[in-house]
Each structure stands twice: as structure tokens, then as C-alpha cells.
């Protein structure tokens, strides 16, 4: 833990090429269209460009059925400005946990779009390739988590790390609805790395990897204790990974966000 700035993404040329190949070879039997998925989905255009993510519960964290866009938008915005842009559209950002569930859905389950139609394997593979494959250009996305330290003695030593999430905009300020103390998470950067399968299978309710992690090729940057750290995931020719020590004011042309919507049309 330190106050020095660390990149959102890895910088060393260690690949995930074999992992990506395995993901793209995933086979599934394709069921018929599920018309129930599109019920109530009336607040956006082009539902065929969204993926249905069923609601889930993970310990104290739960969320409702939602639709995740296949593509990132709002490239070049920092974390706070991305939240503001999403709020103005009635959309929201994926939390780390939702991002984990999104990847698990793409890898292991039958995927439906917002109309209830099955998304073909080649399209699912292209989405996974865009998220995970180690190659240029740089592709990254913000995730809805910022980290704050509370209860420091004399504002210098000790303290507890909290993750704030489910952000909305209150009087023009990005404000979290939920905050959880971080316990049992992997402390310390792994460059590389952690095992992708292990992380996705055994992620904590927060979405962070457990302290009982397996070694692998996926880069991981722990949350900084500087009260200025946010989360994101990305890949480029130097590697791919989860960064929780990113600077909330950081920007890049390849860094965007998924403008998610609740299935019932609600907003945060």
C-alpha cells in the first residue's frame, strides 16, 4: 500500500493468448429464443445490442436483472465524468462483481440479447476477445468502485479500507449508495499474476480476488489507500488485468464504459 500512482492496466508483456483461445472455443447447445427477456425492456433503443445479465445475490451484494451493452462507449472520459454521462442517460456502470458475472455468463452460459434472441457464438467470442485478448489497440473500461480509508488514527496510521459502489449523481456530485469494508481480499499487486478461472469462480462478493488466490497470467493491482483509487479492467499488447489502484482523473482514448440499464427500466 502506497500513495504512488499506479497504472490502471499492466505494463509488462505477459500474455493471456492461450486463455483467450480457450474462451473462444467454448461450445454450447443453442436453445430457442426467450421472449420473456424483452418484457418491460422499453426504455432504450436497439435492444439487440445489449446482453441480458440475470440478477444475482452474493452475500450482502445483490442486483436485479439488467442489460449490458455489447460495446463500450464514452471513450476518453475520466471515471467521474463517465458516471455523470451515464446518469444523464439513465444508465449506470458495472460494479466489479457484475463484471465478473458478465464474464462468467459470456464464457459458460447461453447468452441472450435484449430481445431474448440467442447471441451466436462468434459474436460472444468477439466480445470476449475484445475484453481479454492481449493485443493492441488498448481497450479498457471503468468499473463502479472507488476505495476509501476510514478510521485512521490521527489521520496517519491504521484504518480500514472500504469499497464504495452503486454510484449516482446527487447535486452534481458522484455519490455512492453502498459502502462495504474490504475483508479477505488479495492485498498486494500481482504483475503477473492471478489465475483468470480462479478469480471468476471464487471472487469475493465485492468481485475482488480472494487472498487465497492461484497464480496465473492476469495482472492485478490492489486498491490503493490514497482515497483516490478507482477500478477498471483492460488489455493491450503488454497484458490484461484488473486494476483497483487507478486514478479517478485518468483518461485515455481507449478507456470507456458500458452504459448498463435495469431490465425493469429503473434508474439509480
Language model: regions and residue ranges:
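Histidine (H) residue identity feature
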Residues: 58, 74, 83, 108, ...
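A short glycine-rich, aromatic-capped structural motif
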Residues: 2, 11-13, 17-105
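Charged, often glycine-rich, active-site loop that binds/positions anionic groups
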Residues: 100-118
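N-terminal low-structure segments adjacent to metalloprotease catalytic domains
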Residues: 1-3, 246
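C-terminal, surface-exposed recognition/capping segments
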Residues: 112-268
